[in-house]
Amino acid sequence: MQKQAELYRGKAKTVYSTENPDLLVLEFRNDTSAGDGARIEKFDRKGMVNNKFNHFIMTKLAEAGIPTQMERLLSDTECLVKKLEMVPVECVVRNRAAGSLVKRLGVEEGMELNPPIFDLFLKNDALHDPMVNSSYCETFGWVSQENLARMKALTYKANDVLKKLFDDAGLILVDFKLEFGLYKGEVVLGDEFSPDGSRLWDKETLDKMDKDRFRQSLGGLIEAYEAVARRLGVKLD
């Protein structure tokens, strides 16, 4: 399957059309951003690591009964996916307090959250992805209440699957975001799951193994990504 026209260039991925109107190519680039794209740097191997990481996770979620847009890997940095009508709202699950939750509520970083917190954010960099709720989604027509309920259920199911997967690899799944779309009327998991959109800590040391290493200028970003991938059993080379 050959990529054709560039349809969209995001902060770290480029989307291309194919000869099949129902399929797209996602290309993972080496770009890494923080501050809603205000700071961008390139890291060798990052596109490859995230592409293979994402394929691995999407495969695990599909095996657990979660519908995903993933079709197959095409190359080190590209995968073939179903074309979705994306919902402009992203779902976040928090198992421990970190990031914006700590800033907003003043709670201690690392505090266990039981049950996990479910948040919704409007995908809009210019507005810094404001938090919204189901009432906003209904009023502004972003997603139906039925589909939103399905998104929430699938997000919690993904959390159950991934918490165990990472725990078995000696990692804490602190939080993560998921994006969904519609494929022929069905809610389907889209975009990606990688250390770019999740927080992962080492279970013993609590070392951060995700994009916070870039956000907080801790260094060792790709080394951390590759370490997480190898612990999970992702074949990188």
Swiss-Prot record:
Catalytic activities: 5-amino-1-(5-phospho-D-ribosyl)imidazole-4-carboxylate + L-aspartate + ATP = (2S)-2-[5-amino-1-(5-phospho-beta-D-ribosyl)imidazole-4-carboxamido]succinate + ADP + phosphate + 2 H(+)
The organism's place on the tree of life at top rank: Bacteria
Alphabetic keyword roster: ATP-binding, Ligase, Nucleotide-binding, Purine biosynthesis
Enzyme Commission identifier(s): 6.3.2.6
CC per GO annotation: cytosol
Pathway: Purine metabolism; IMP biosynthesis via de novo pathway; 5-amino-1-(5-phospho-D-ribosyl)imidazole-4-carboxamide from 5-amino-1-(5-phospho-D-ribosyl)imidazole-4-carboxylate: step 1/2
GO BP annotations, alphabetical order: 'de novo' IMP biosynthetic process; cobalamin biosynthetic process
Pfam family, any one: SAICAR_synt
Gene3D superfamilies given in the database record: ATP-grasp fold, B domain, Phosphorylase Kinase, domain 1
Family designation: Belongs to the SAICAR synthetase family.
Identification of the protein by name: Phosphoribosylaminoimidazole-succinocarboxamide synthase
The organism of origin for this protein: Salmonella arizonae (strain ATCC BAA-731 / CDC346-86 / RSK2980)
Gene encoding the protein: purC
